[in-house]
Swiss-Prot record:
GO terms for molecular function: protein-cysteine S-palmitoyltransferase activity. The gene is ptr-1. Keywords: Acyltransferase, ANK repeat, Endosome, Golgi apparatus, Lipoprotein, Membrane, Palmitate, Repeat, Transferase, Transmembrane, Transmembrane helix. Palmitoyltransferase specific for casein kinase 1. This is Palmitoyltransferase akr1.
Length: 729
């Protein structure tokens, strides 16, 4: 029996190696040697050669001679349309269809249609053309595969999304009962599995041997596929016709490690049973795990910061510092044990509100210390400091206000479509504009992505004018809350400065009667430390925050004056003509209007593990400790900007060589940002902003500023700028 991967699978075999085919018929001869090799020079082969290379002029002459027409087929039933489709000759396909080519004609050793030939090579522009002219995606070849099955073999997510929007049943089976979900799980394409599951594919469907998609995912052992299926409720104990459970299948195929890892990530033990913690009230608290974990990881850092401060303040320095660090680590260890029961996407502290909780806890302790100790001493004492106290009260109030706004407000999520019909209309429009690619369409949100937007994997939404995802506010910073974020940083800086000054005044007065005995410090410093160690530690801890806040403020000031976001500064702005058009024509072959468009490049990568530059959802490699904290604290952006390597300051950088289409000069850029008429304390209209003094909305801005100001329409090709692309900030 012939298989795609050369493996045998018999109905009675202990474990599957590959879904069985319908017959022993080989797949069509679609290798590069057949496509690109020299064809015989007989007249009946010349028509195929012309179709293969897209020679429309020659084809017209051949038809004019009257010997052949568009319905011609060879002895195997292969038509010119087959060869044009598989070689991505879009213009030739259009020409042949207009000349009456039989669009659903079967041919070749696999007895497949031109649509299936195009789908096998992931030529989704050609696929769309054929579908628009009546190609039937449900026709099967000699092995029982329809177009959706064939498209799944290569894992191209955009092609699968295109086909699903044509009304193809997502659970349609091949000759042996395999669904597209089973094939994508077997092939190890997590992105495809995710698309099918979100589209409603059944995780309980079984093939003729009784295998579910979960059984097939264990063949390749892709943890992402296995985990996603379990998350969507796949039966962990489903038995095949031979009584094989997924656990037995994993053992026979040596994929036990991937199986158990996926179970653990989803909250199950190695036997597939739900793990319930033994601590009191666990069953009640974990009824809504996500809600509980969000609240717990935000509030528990309050305890960690307080415990660390109290231990350090209450003991001698040589003992207090190590014990304080140990106390903080112990509290964090408890949190790590608790989040072991969190949803899969919250199993790491940096993916929870933990960092936001550390800041909020620190802020709370400083405010309480000011109210209980510093305020009374410095406000009503002999040498009162009324104005500094009032200033601190104002700055800290503004810090709290803008911090909450940054955390809870919509950062500028791009609205999703109302249904499948609207999504299909968007896809059809993008294809008509030659823009149906990873940079212009988000397969997770199923929307057209506006300029400067980016899909955030943490928020699972596309954010308009995305700046970065900030773990300290547990939210994205986008067009709606960017200015609030800036004011939060400014007021935080002023709050720390005034708090330090008030603490100094407070300790100076208190130290006059304090003991001057300590281990290593001078008597004058000993009196300050002994006066109120806890207040001194809170001031030191608050001052430490000025390091990352100062760097972040510097970077933000530079970027605002240059009309750039953090993401654009770190990754640059892609040029429209150099990226989008080249990407689109790698999928369309010969253009309908050759003089106006660039030549096609290499074929785009399949989307199994990664289906787009900006919208990549594959697994990232683990970063080192220093690099991870460098990103969390904004040190990497500061170094890039200060060293002149960022897009805002790098003069010779490739990322900056085409200039910034959003910049209108430093003064105008700052005016656009700071004088935005959107209310500071009221509700912000989603996506509203100002660009060059002109109101714009970044949730539906699809043309570059140059095109808009020149009055260009949606089909303008050259000189514009495309959406930014890359991985999460």
């Amino acid at each position: 029996m012939v298989h795609h991967d050369g493996a045998d699978a018999h109905a009675g075999h202990a474990a599957p190696a590959q879904p069985p085919m319908k017959s022993d018929t080989a797949t069509p001869k679609l290798n590069s040697e057949v496509e690109l090799g020299s064809l015989p020079s007989e007249a009946h082969n010349d028509i195929m050669q012309m179709a293969r290379v897209g020679d429309i002029t020659g084809m017209e002459k051949l038809f004019a001679a009257g010997e052949y027409d568009a319905t011609y087929s060879d002895d195997e039933g292969i038509t010119p349309l087959h060869w044009a489709a598989i070689n991505n000759q879009y213009a030739m396909c259009k020409f042949l269809i207009d000349k009456g080519a039989e669009i659903n004609k079967k041919g070749g050793e696999s007895v497949a249609t031109p649509l299936q030939w195009a789908a096998q090579r992931c030529h989704y522009y050609t696929v769309h053309l054929l579908l628009q002219h009546g190609a039937d995606p449900l026709i099967t070849d000699s092995q029982g595969y329809n177009t959706l099955h064939i498209s799944t073999f290569n894992g191209n997510v955009l092609l699968i999304v295109l086909l699903l929007h044509q009304g193809i049943p997502v659970d349609v089976e091949d000759a042996y009962g395999h669904t597209a979900l089973m094939w994508s799980a077997y092939k190890g394409f997590p992105a495809c599995v995710d698309v099918f599951l979100r589209w409603g594919a059944s995780v309980h469907a079984k093939d003729e041997q009784g295998f579910t998609a979960l059984h097939w995912a264990l063949v390749k052992g892709s943890p992402g596929c296995i985990q996603k299926l379990i998350e969507y409720g796949a039966d962990r104990f489903a038995k095949t016709a031979n009584g094989k459970t997924p656990a037995i299948t994993a053992q026979e195929l040596n994929t036990v490690a991937a199986w158990q890892k996926a179970l653990d990530e989803c909250g199950y033990d190695e036997h597939g049973n739900a793990i319930v913690p033994s601590w009191p009230g666990a069953s009640y608290l974990l009824q809504d795990r996500r809600s509980f974990m969000t609240k717990f990881t935000f509030l528990w850092p309050f305890v960690m910061v307080w415990a660390t401060m109290v231990v350090m303040a209450g003991m001698p320095v040589f003992v207090g510092i190590p014990l304080g660090v140990l106390a903080g680590y112990a509290v964090q260890w408890v949190a790590q044990q608790v989040i072991a029961y969190a949803p899969p996407d919250m199993r790491q502290l940096q993916k929870t509100p933990w960092m936001a909780g550390i800041f909020a806890g620190s802020l709370f302790l400083c405010i309480m210390n000011w109210l209980l100790h510093i305020f009374g001493s410095t406000m009503f004492g002999q040498d009162s400091a009324v104005i500094p106290n009032l200033l601190f009260a104002f700055f800290i109030s503004m810090t709290i206000w803008f911090y909450i706004r940054c955390m809870v407000d919509d950062p500028g999520f791009v609205p999703k479509m109302g249904g499948v019909a609207e999504q299909k209309a968007v896809i059809d429009e993008l294809i008509s504009l030659w823009k149906f690619d990873e940079s212009n369409f988000c397969v997770t949100c199923m929307i057209r992505t506006p300029l400067r937007s980016k899909h955030c994997r943490r928020c699972q939404r596309c954010v308009a004018k995305h700046d970065h995802h900030c773990p300290w506010v547990y939210n994205c910073i986008g067009v709606n809350n960017h200015r609030h974020f800036f004011f939060y940083l400014i007021n935080l800086t002023l709050s720390v400065v005034t708090y330090d000054w008030l603490t100094y005044r407070y300790l100076s007065t208190l130290s006059e009667t304090a003991s001057d005995e300590c281990n290593i410090l001078a008597p004058s410093l000993c009196r300050i430390v002994n006066a109120d160690t806890y207040s001194l530690l809170t001031a030191i801890w608050a001052s430490l925050q000025l390091t990352w806040v100062s760097m972040l403020l510097f970077v933000q000031f530079v970027q605002v004056s240059s009309a750039m976001t953090t993401y654009e500064n770190m990754h640059g702005i892609d040029n429209y003509s150099a990226t989008s058009l080249n990407s689109s024509f790698t999928s369309t072959g010969a253009p309908l209007n050759p003089p106006s468009l660039p030549a096609p490049g290499p074929s785009p990568a399949a989307g199994g593990a990664r289906h787009g530059g900006r919208h990549a959802h594959g697994h990232n490699h683990k970063q080192g400790f220093i690099k991870q904290w460098s990103r969390l604290l904004g040190v990497d952006a500061f170094i890039e900007t200060a060293a002149g390597r960022g897009a805002t300051t790098g003069k010779g950088s490739k990322r900056n060589k085409r200039g910034n289409p959003y910049s209108r000069g430093c003064v105008t850029n700052c005016k656009d940002f700071w004088c935005d008429p959107s209310p500071m304390f009221g509700k912000h209209e989603n996506g509203a902003a100002v660009l060059g003094g002109v109101p714009v909305n970044y949730t539906d801005m699809y043309e570059s500023p140059g095109v808009m100001t020149s009055g260009g329409g949606g089909r303008r090709r050259g000189g514009g700028y495309e959406s930014v692309a890359g991985e999460e900030v």
